[in-house]
Amino acid sequence: KRSLRDLGILVNQIIPEGGSLKCLKDLPRAWFNVVPYREVGLMTAIFLEKEYGMPYVSVTPMGILDTAEFVRQMERLVNAWASVLPEKQANYSSYIKDQTNFV
């Protein structure tokens, strides 16, 4: 959650954390889904992609390389949605550098 917040990405929902059936109706409002652990949520993300065209990131952000790839994939998805607003294009390379600089 902290990484998403640091990148300025608003979280629609965290499933199953605090989720309820009433919250499910809001799932299609998301631009994309994050599946940090493939064992939990991947089938749901695949379903949402098929049904609603909602892409997902399924890289587990552990370690330097996978965390950087996780952030790059989110950057691509954010920029795909923000393509109508060129001045709002995301560039997370400085975030990746800051997070991995002293490791």
From Swiss-Prot:
Alphabetical UniProt keywords: 4Fe-4S, ATP-binding, Chlorophyll biosynthesis, Chloroplast, Iron, Iron-sulfur, Metal-binding, Nucleotide-binding, Oxidoreductase, Photosynthesis, Plastid
Record-level Gene Ontology MF annotations: 4 iron, 4 sulfur cluster binding; ATP binding; metal ion binding; oxidoreductase activity
GO cellular component labels: chloroplast
Domain of life, per lineage: Eukaryota
Keyword Cell membrane carried by entry: no
Pathway where it operates: Porphyrin-containing compound metabolism; chlorophyll biosynthesis (light-independent)
Cofactor note text: Binds 1 [4Fe-4S] cluster per heterodimer. The cluster is bound at the heterodimer interface by residues from both subunits.
EC class (word): oxidoreductase
Record has ATP-binding as a keyword: yes
Compartments in which it is found: Plastid, Chloroplast
UniProt main location, coarse: plastid
Cofactor section: [4Fe-4S] cluster
Reactions performed catalytically: chlorophyllide a + oxidized 2[4Fe-4S]-[ferredoxin] + 2 ADP + 2 phosphate = protochlorophyllide a + reduced 2[4Fe-4S]-[ferredoxin] + 2 ATP + 2 H2O
EC number annotated for this UniProt entry: 1.3.7.7
InterPro entries: ChlB/BchB/BchZ (IPR050152), Nase/OxRdtase_comp1 (IPR000510)
Protein's GO biological process: light-independent chlorophyll biosynthetic process; photosynthesis
Function: Component of the dark-operative protochlorophyllide reductase (DPOR) that uses Mg-ATP and reduced ferredoxin to reduce ring D of protochlorophyllide (Pchlide) to form chlorophyllide a (Chlide). This reaction is light-independent. The NB-protein (ChlN-ChlB) is the catalytic component of the complex.
Family membership: Belongs to the ChlB/BchB/BchZ family.
Self-association and partners: Protochlorophyllide reductase is composed of three subunits; ChlL, ChlN and ChlB. Forms a heterotetramer of two ChlB and two ChlN subunits.
Protein name as catalogued: Light-independent protochlorophyllide reductase subunit B
Gene for this chain: chlB
